[in-house]
Design a protein with these regions (language model features):
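Intrinsically disordered, low-complexity, charged/polar segments
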Residues: 1-7, 111-133
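Short aromatic-glycine-enriched beta-strand elements
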Residues: 98-101
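Short, solvent-exposed aromatic-acidic interface loops
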Residues: 105-109
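Secreted/periplasmic proteins that engage bacterial cell-wall peptidoglycan
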Residues: 1-93, 103-104
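Generic beta-strand structural signal
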Residues: 94-96, 118-119
Length: 133
């Protein structure tokens, strides 16, 4: 399955990969690993922010001024004062130096998977599959 097919299939749906805690951002990430990347699941994590330290077979790029992000990369954000778990989303496009267009799911709102603008603020980096998408 391609990223475009994944988005079309899951847009507006509540993706609950593990059947626990409702539809969270990590559930969409795990479905993406299964359906698009076709890789073994990465290790369990306490929150989305921890995915970057347990990438499994995926490569890691830490955020910096020189970081180069590509469509299909898995972006990981750190915890905030209002979200101790962090966030994970799939990169659809780089909008500019400060924003991305992502495919994501919000575990707090429980409103299903959607395309959204997401700030680079708090970005830890990304996971990507060696060999492309």
């Amino acid at each position: 399955m391609t990223l475009t097919q994944f988005i079309k299939t899951n847009q507006g749906k509540k993706v609950d990969f593990d059947g626990k805690y409702g539809a969270q951002c990590v559930d969409l990430y795990r479905a993406y690993c299964r359906d698009v990347l076709d890789i073994q699941q990465t290790p369990s994590v306490a929150g989305a922010k921890d995915i970057i330290t347990k990438p499994g077979v995926l490569e890691v790029t830490r955020d910096s001024a020189l970081a180069d992000y590509s469509r299909g990369d898995v972006l990981v954000w750190d915890a905030t004062s209002s979200n101790k778990y962090g966030h994970v989303a799939i990169l659809v496009a780089v909008y500019n130096t400060k924003y991305f267009i992502v495919f994501e799911q919000d575990g707090f709102k429980q409103d299903g998977a959607k395309l959204a603008f997401r700030s680079r603020e708090g970005l830890l980096g990304c996971l990507w599959r060696n060999g492309g998408y």
